Every structure is written in structure tokens, then in C-alpha cells.
Design a protein with these regions (language model features):
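Acidic/glycine-enriched connector segments
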Residues: 3-186
Length: 186
């Protein structure tokens, strides 16, 4: 059976416009003619300007999460600064709007993803959304099964509304993984 590629005109990327992985997801989306919605907030340094959606104070509050809960869930401590809280709130909007989630980062031994990006991956798990992480350190894609991470050689975007997020420290292999993902899918 022949698999038909997604129609890019039907798709929307939900991301965050920050430097690194989010910017690379946006560049790939633009190259393929995909609409972009980049959630941001006043005072955030955005690298992308296409599809900017500035979240209001009330919208940010919708994505608020207890840092005590998050610290227990992620097995680490987070700083309680207004900027970090807004970053977590904006990530909530990315994941909430995406039907399928793609992350660039590093999976730690405890199964969580490193950094603030890890909240996006954990929220996707909690919402039971298809979740893929490209681990830059292992140079490989992983898919969350609901219980564990398993190798996924060539994932494709299969939902019209998808989220792309990840580390600000994007390595060449991470950028290639994003470009290859879009080329396979569209």
C-alpha cells in the first residue's frame, strides 16, 4: 500500500519562535508552505516573526502548573522566576494545540527530557499524545509508547496540527533530523 504524504496546506505547526529547535521547526514549516503559530509573551526574545501569537496574561494563566508538582514529576528543581514560569506556560499552549508532538533534546536516564523542554514532553505524555524525541546525544529518534521510549527510525508527521519544540542548543544532527522529518512527511 502506498503511503501518501501529508498535504502541507492543511497543516499547522505550533511552536514557540525561540532560537534553536523552535526556530528550525519554523524554518522547515515555512519551506514546506505550512502555517505556523508561534506562542510567545511580552518580553520574550523571539527568533522567528512568522505566525507570532502573543499570549495574554489570562491565556498564560491557563497553562500555569505547580512548580512543586513539576519538580516531583521531573525529578529536578526548577527556579520560580516569572520568566521561567511564562516559558512553561507558553510550552503548555504548544502541546495543548498539537495533536502530535516532536521534540529535539536529550532523554535522561529517568526517562524525562532535559531542561524546560522536558515539561513539554511530560505534558504530552500526560495528555496521551503521540510523542517523538530526537536525542541529539544518541543521534536517534525515540517514540513514547505509554510505558517506555523505543527506537523510531524514520518518524513522519501524521496529524494536521502538530507541535515542534526543543532545546535552544540545536546541534547540526538535530537540525538535520528536523529537515529530514519534514522532507519525509511532505
Amino acid at each position: 500500500m502506498k503511503v501518501v504524504a501529508m498535504n502541507s496546506e492543511d497543516c499547522i505547526l505550533f511552536s514557540g519562535a525561540a532560537a534553536g529547535a523552535e526556530s528550525a521547526f519554523g524554518e522547515a514549516a515555512e519551506r514546506h508552505g505550512i502555517e505556523e503559530v508561534n506562542f510567545t509573551f511580552e518580553g520574550h526574545k523571539d527568533e522567528r516573526t512568522r505566525g507570532i501569537r502573543v499570549l495574554t496574561h489570562l491565556e498564560l494563566k491557563q497553562g500555569d502548573v505547580s512548580l512543586a508538582y513539576l519538580s516531583r514529576l521531573m525529578n529536578r528543581t526548577y527556579s520560580n522566576t516569572p520568566l521561567f514560569r511564562r516559558v512553561l506556560q507558553s510550552i503548555w499552549h504548544q502541546i495543548n494545540n498539537g495533536q502530535e508532538i516532536f521534540v529535539i533534546g536529550h532523554i535522561l536516564k529517568d526517562g524525562t527530557v532535559k531542561g524546560g523542554t522536558g515539561w513539554g514532553a511530560e505534558f504530552a505524555k500526560l495528555c496521551n499524545k503521540p510523542l517523538y524525541v530526537f536525542d541529539q546525544d544518541d543521534n536517534s529518534w525515540r517514540r513514547w509508547t505509554g510505558d517506555a521510549w523505543v527506537a523510531e527510525s524514520n518518524p513522519k508527521i501524521t496529524h494536521t496540527h502538530f507541535a515542534g519544540t526543543g532545546t535552544r542548543i540545536l546541534q547540526p544532527n538535530g537540525k538535520k533530523a528536523i529537515n529530514d522529518l519534514f522532507d519525509r512527511s511532505f
